Amino acid sequence: MLQVFDIIGPIMIGPSESITAGAVRIXKI
């Protein structure tokens, strides 16, 4: 999971909404 966040971190660098959307995507996976 840490690796996934490490990749999404730099890509989803933005507002909290973007980070939340990324978290939801991880949950979907």
Swiss-Prot record:
Coiled coil: none annotated. It catalyses: L-serine = pyruvate + NH4(+). Pathway: Carbohydrate biosynthesis; gluconeogenesis. It is an enzyme of class 4 (lyase). Keywords: 4Fe-4S, Gluconeogenesis, Iron, Iron-sulfur, Lyase, Metal-binding. Its EC number is 4.3.1.17. Belongs to the iron-sulfur dependent L-serine dehydratase family. This is L-serine dehydratase, beta chain.
